Amino acid sequence: MIKNIRFSIGADNESKCVSIAKEYLIKNNYPLIEYGSLAGDGLDWVEVAKKVSRDVQQNKSDFGLLFCYTGTGVTIVANKFKGIRAALCNNQEVAEGARKWNNANVLGIGLMSVKESDIKGILSMWIKTRADDSELKNIE
């Protein structure tokens, strides 16, 4: 695992999948800034997505991790922020492609479609995959 990566993580509702993701990041010593149900601040999904996106935009975090029921809404909100490249990734292959080919910096997860048993693999793939510099010209 690559160390010294900071995450801002947010969800509007608690779920086992969100808890597994948080525990995985803590276990692997990734610093976290938490929003929404994770922080007990009662923010809705729109505000959670905005706060996580601002953290990444302002370099308070290297990556954002957003959860909502479909994952679509938080991803759309995140992509409204300059410099944010949010990708909805519900499996390892999509997470790898989003990082490699699109240099995505915010990971959206749909709670209705990701199995609890898959979340660690998605996060691991996201963290270990580096952007392919030859592809960056296509997204800038």
Regions found by a protein language model. Name each.
Residues 6-7, 60-64, 83-85:
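Short active-site oxyanion
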